[in-house]
Amino acid sequence: MAPSFDFAASILLCAEDNTAILDLGEESEEISWVVGVDASLGDLSMDFPLQSDDCIEALLGREEQQHIPMEGYLQRLLLQPDGLDLVAVRSDAIDWIWKVHELYKFGPLTAVLSVNYLDRFLSVFDLPQEEACMTQLLAVASLSLAAKMEETVVPHPLDLQVCDAKYVFETRTIKRMELAVLNALKWRMQAVTACSFIDYYLHKFNDDDTPSTSALSRSVDLILSTCKVAEFLVFRPSEIAASVALVALEEHETSMFERVATCYKNLKKERVLRCYEMIQDKIIMRNIMRQSAGSVFSIPKSPIGVLDAAACISQQSEDTFVGSPATNYESSASSKRRRICR
């Protein structure tokens, strides 16, 4: 069982200098793995830097040691302690992140990092169940930190709290939560994610040719979608990236992958193929839903629709990937009625 939240809560109560909270200036800004991003999820157009073989091998060694949730995190989510559906709680938090991400047209890596921070924190600390607002506070802090890492223009913390947010937190409270996250993650914020590997595998599985824009767009869609489905937490970022590349390229032959996999002992072919099959299973599930539902409701044919449909089945809820910007702006009009949390 993870440690209690007492340590993080004590940080929330202490006073700190606002300039110490990840105040990144031009001289200290880290280079993003994703460059040239058109942040609209509906029309992704981006270039990922192609990593060298040596760089990929180094990333494979780093990802498990520093940048993924603690072992046993998924099992703890599925146990539902005291009847609390932690998978649904996590999904709700990610739903909200997706809505704000779309509203502000953040880049895809901002969304991926937000979920990475949220999961890594939850794998270390148990949030108090009696404080429903704590999960939302964590979601706000995770998104704020990710935006500071990746975006050139970062909204004020108060401006992030839109899109049907149930609580509104003061800026100082958000900054204290950010500090709690930073300490829990040991300030390792430039996380190794599936985005770190995707361009490399797209090239390798495409005979070292530059992948098409549609293949890259599908890959990003799938990476974003796998973030929400809790079952994919059992896989490492490199395994998800390799599987996503195979699906995006509609690659059914594994001979090329076998040649690549033999180069890196840290990349296990069996796990990649298992992840690949899980994604394909979600596609089959989507098709069954479309056939059985008929005209009652339709599920998008995109990868996002595929995995969101799977999440919908597993949670018995109609989850969506992103919220409508129009709805998001309308929801801000009622913000005065929401509780302000100090």
Swiss-Prot record:
Keyword hit for Transmembrane helix: no
Lineage top rank: taxon: Eukaryota
Any one GO biological process: G1/S transition of mitotic cell cycle
Stretches for region Disordered: 322-342
Alphabetically ordered keywords of this record: Cell cycle, Cell division, Cyclin
A GO term from the CC aspect: cyclin-dependent protein kinase holoenzyme complex
The keyword GTP-binding appears for this protein: no
Residue stretches in coiled coil: none
UniProt-listed PROSITE patterns: CYCLINS (PS00292)
GO molecular function: cyclin-dependent protein serine/threonine kinase regulator activity
InterPro entries referenced in this protein's UniProt entry, alphabetically: Cyclin (IPR039361), Cyclin-like_dom (IPR013763), Cyclin-like_sf (IPR036915), Cyclin_C-dom (IPR004367), Cyclin_N (IPR006671), Cyclins_cyclin-box (IPR048258)
Biased composition (Polar residues): 322-334
Record family assignment: Belongs to the cyclin family. Cyclin D subfamily.
Protein name in the entry: Cyclin-D3-1
Organism: Oryza sativa subsp. japonica (Rice)
